[in-house]
Amino acid sequence: MQNSMHLLRTRRFVPIFLTQFLGAFNDNLFRTAMVMLVIYGIYRDPQQEATFSAIAGGLFILPFFVLSALAGQLADERDKAAIVRIVKTAEILIMLVGAAGLLLQNVPALLFALCAMGIHSTFFGPIKYAILPQHLRGDEVLAGTGLVEAGTYIGILGGTLLGGVLVLQNPDGSFHAKWAAVAVIAVAIVGRITGHFVPPAPPDPDAPPFHFDWHIVRASIRLVSATLHIPRLFLAIIAISFFWAMGAVLAAQFPPLVKNALGADQTVATLFLATFSVGVALGSVAINRLLGGEVSAKFAPAAAIAMGLFVLDLYRRVRVWPGEGPELRDLSTFLAMDGSWLIVFDLLGVAIAGGMFVVPLYAFLTTTVPKSETARTIAANNIVNSGLMVFATLVLTGAVMMGVTVADSLLIVAAASTLAAWLGWKLHLACD
């Protein structure tokens, strides 16, 4: 069995691990600070708050759908390490705009920076997975993928916690995010420094040449069709897409769910986001232990079913929760209430199962195709992922506008998990 921890001592893995960790940390530091500031400090209407959360999620995801084909081609054609350095430099500039939005409490500036960070992540996303087969041995790829996924969610945890803590309340009851504005710029600078040490990852000189297509629509169609015609890749990509769509719905609804269904404040919303992040990180590392380094989908169906069962139990508990009191409950008050720890346990269970579901599928994508095509394969996956995630957020936004409660939206996730389990089973039969 390949122990993943030894990779954290290697020069060929640590720089990309730290760079992607800091990227995830900063994404979520900014997004959490933005959402907390807007929901608790600017808006006062539950429907407006839920709609904002869904729109913000959609704006971040939209660039993945539009620009992933260009990002994948670029990563396969050029040195991936050089692209990392360019992208991390851009992050500093984007966070200057985001910091201004936080300081001025300017919603358009915040949404602009959020969309720009989506573009940043679109170009970095294919690299953080596609670079692994170039720097790691074949029996290390699953371990490396698990660590990257775990690092991503630990970064989400850290950024989420700090983003929630740095949105502070003034004596007059208003909120500010001054320290969050400083933090997002500082983290972007550190990420650029770690990106400087990523080892070179040039394109394969023996790979067949391909024509770089700058036409966004045509390139996207060609890339997706060229990838999805392979049945195993089709099943893996659709299964991953269902996971991310479910995650998008859950993440978008955590703050309004906590405030409007559970009657709790931003500290509880931060706990929910943090719990989810820890769970995915635990599942990402645990699955490598279970599989012994083997790239296999044999646990995917059970993991997806477990996700659905935990979501259903979460829905059941939220439905019978006492609801709002005279004022929003803080973290200690919430945790002292009957059933609160079971809600947290359900969230943790959903996340652990999710990490165990998705990590082998990513490893499968990067090991099934030649190294010269890994970035484009991940990019095709990102296009399909983002398309389904945007569709999910649109459905969620429409459902909220039609009067569906935040709690009832959990049923959408539970239903999607059954389809994810079926896809995981089909992939297991096709590949294992």
Residue locations for each model-derived region?
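Extracellular/periplasmic helix-loop-helix junction of adjacent transmembrane segments
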Residues: 33-64
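Hydrophobic alpha-helical transmembrane segments
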Residues: 107-114, 118, 143-206, 279, ...
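Membrane-helix boundary and inter-helical linker elements of multi-pass secondary transporters
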Residues: 9, 76-77, 103, 134, ...
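Alpha-helical transmembrane segments of multipass membrane proteins
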Residues: 96-100, 164-165, 192-193, 223, ...
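Juxtamembrane intracellular "pre-TM" segments in multi-pass secondary transporters
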Residues: 1-14, 201-238, 261, 327-336
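Juxtamembrane transmembrane-helix termini
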Residues: 40-43, 104, 108, 197, ...
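Substrate-agnostic recognition of the 12-TM MFS/MFS-like secondary transporter fold
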Residues: 14-32, 56-94, 109-168, 235, ...
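C-terminal transmembrane bundle of multi-pass solute transporters/carriers
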Residues: 52-54, 59, 66, 77, ...
